[in-house]
Amino acid sequence: MDYTLTRIDPNGENDRYPLQKQEIVTDPLEQEINKSVYMGKLEHALHDMVNWGRKNSIWPYNFGLSCCYVEMVTSFTAVHDVARFGAEVLRASPRQADLMVVAGTCFTKMAPVIQRLYDQMLEPKWVISMGACANSGGMYDIYSVVQGVDKFIPVDVYIPGCPPRPEAYMQALMLLQESIGKERRPLSWVVGDQGVYRANMQSERERKRGERIAVTNLRTPDEI
């Protein structure tokens, strides 16, 4: 099998990622104002029920690239019990999964394989980039390592760390669940708007900025 890795031109035409034009729009719920009270409330309730089922039954695809995968599977142990979030059903096939966790270093030879696995996943699907290597290449600023998996697939949640702790992975699942709960996808092929709307989530750094600035008592360097 021949592997190729093509750099994406954000301003050019590309039949792969991004698979559709992405732009920031106003809240899609505002269009419900123009509908009748009954149909607007009914469609809003249907979206909430569908998103509740999706966010509480996330099936991750079982594969790993490097040491971050060890931290990922640690969250499945009884100590952390990721089953509380409905994400314990590991799938051996991408066609049965809706979450891909890129855990570890993404080498240039592995990038086309990850791209193909992502294409085989059915919608709706989400991606978590776990660890510094998956986010930006980490300390491997060399020709053989892709400097971030978001160069060729869309990423929903980034987990910093080298490697991140299992608690960080579980927090990423909670953030992903929050994002899924605010999504608006077509209820069917013929009913409602056919566009996919994803909430513009605030980064954790920005969300906690005020709380961190307000801290007056700092811990000493020898404390954990």
Curated annotation (Swiss-Prot):
Organism: Citrobacter koseri (strain ATCC BAA-895 / CDC 4225-83 / SGSC4696)
Top-rank taxon, per record: Bacteria
Record Pfam families: Oxidored_q6
Cofactor, free-text remark: Binds 1 [4Fe-4S] cluster.
Lipid bilayer topology: Peripheral membrane protein
Keywords for this protein: 4Fe-4S, Cell inner membrane, Cell membrane, Iron, Iron-sulfur, Membrane, Metal-binding, NAD, Quinone, Translocase, Transport, Ubiquinone
Function field: NDH-1 shuttles electrons from NADH, via FMN and iron-sulfur (Fe-S) centers, to quinones in the respiratory chain. The immediate electron acceptor for the enzyme in this species is believed to be ubiquinone. Couples the redox reaction to proton translocation (for every two electrons transferred, four hydrogen ions are translocated across the cytoplasmic membrane), and thus conserves the redox energy in a proton gradient.
Gene it is expressed from: nuoB
Any single GO BP term: aerobic respiration
InterPro entries in the record: NADH_UbQ_OxRdtase-like_20kDa (IPR006137), NADH_UQ_OxRdtase_20Kd_su (IPR006138)
Family: Belongs to the complex I 20 kDa subunit family.
Cofactor: [4Fe-4S] cluster
Name of the featured protein: NADH-quinone oxidoreductase subunit B
Cellular component GO terms, alphabetical: plasma membrane; respiratory chain complex I
Catalysed reactions, semicolon-separated: a quinone + NADH + 5 H(+)(in) = a quinol + NAD(+) + 4 H(+)(out)
Binding residues annotated for [4Fe-4S] cluster, in chain numbering: C67, C68, C133, C162
Localization per record: Cell inner membrane
Top enzyme category: translocase
Quaternary structure annotation from Swiss-Prot or TrEMBL: NDH-1 is composed of 13 different subunits. Subunits NuoB, CD, E, F, and G constitute the peripheral sector of the complex.
Gene Ontology MF annotations: 4 iron, 4 sulfur cluster binding; iron ion binding; NADH dehydrogenase (ubiquinone) activity; NADH:ubiquinone reductase (non-electrogenic) activity; quinone binding
Listed EC numbers: 7.1.1.-
